[in-house]
Amino acid sequence: QQRFPQRYVMLAIVADHGMVTKYSGNSSAITTRVHQMVSHVTEMYSPLNIATTLSLLRIWSSKDLITVQSDSSVTLGSFGDWRKVVLLSQQAHDCAFLNTATALDDSTIGLAYSNGMCDPKFSVGLVQDHSSNVFMVAVTMTHELGHNLGMAHDEAGGCACSSCIMSPAASSGPSKLFSDCSKDDYQTFLTNTNPQCILNAP
């Protein structure tokens, strides 16, 4: 059993205007959903000694502040730029996620930059609100945050684990567990990169 050092990830979550439309303008429904999501994410990261907290929630009530399109890499890039220029200067956080109601191309349900944690532009992720079951969406967020934290997919080189969090395809009955390979990837990321922003308790 690996012993991981205590780290803290303060999340900023932005719900796009499509989410506002999807939930009929009910911002309290979106807020409740996001809080439930973060509580699942927190639970999944606790074995790695990572405490995740929601440091801010933005709901784009009147309009999107970036162009949200079905090309996930373009949308993620735009969101990263916006986060770097706008959101970071407004409130401290370590990583920002855009929750979108837009259907993404190629049956993608999430995207994030590998090893991006603490970088002003690259510490971001994109998650589609792809299931009415909030736990399923939380697993996607946990998976994308894993990429930010240096984790690769559970596939090649004896790391296949179809039910694990970092499996390349979401399974219908997803596990809440990270594979040993994911834990090793995270440990390597901490050793090689030692991202400073996650050292501070919220």
Curated annotation (Swiss-Prot):
UniProt keyword Hydrolase, yes or no: yes
Positions of post-translational Pyrrolidone carboxylic acid modification: 1
Tissues showing expression: Expressed by the venom gland.
GO biological process, one term: proteolysis
Record has Oxidoreductase as a keyword: no
InterPro entries: MetalloPept_cat_dom_sf, Peptidase_M12B, Reprolysin_adamalysin
Keywords: Disulfide bond, Hydrolase, Metal-binding, Metalloprotease, Protease, Pyrrolidone carboxylic acid, Secreted, Zinc
Control of this protein's activity: Inhibited by EDTA and 1,10-phenanthroline. Is also inhibited by endogenous tripeptide inhibitors pyroGlu-Asn-Trp, pyroGlu-Gln-Trp, and pyroGlu-Lys-Trp.
GO cellular component: extracellular region
SUPFAM superfamilies from the UniProt entry: Metalloproteases ('zincins'), catalytic domain
PTM annotation: The N-terminus is blocked.
Domain of life: Eukaryota
Cofactor binding description: Binds 1 zinc ion per subunit.
Domain Peptidase M12B: 7-202
Cofactor(s) required, per the database record: Zn(2+)
Principal place of residence: secreted
UniProt family annotation: Belongs to the venom metalloproteinase (M12B) family. P-I subfamily.
PANTHER family: ADAM A DISINTEGRIN AND METALLOPROTEASE DOMAIN, ADAM METALLOPROTEASE
Assembly and interaction partners: Monomer.
Name of this chain's protein: Snake venom metalloproteinase TM-1
Organism, scientific name: Protobothrops mucrosquamatus
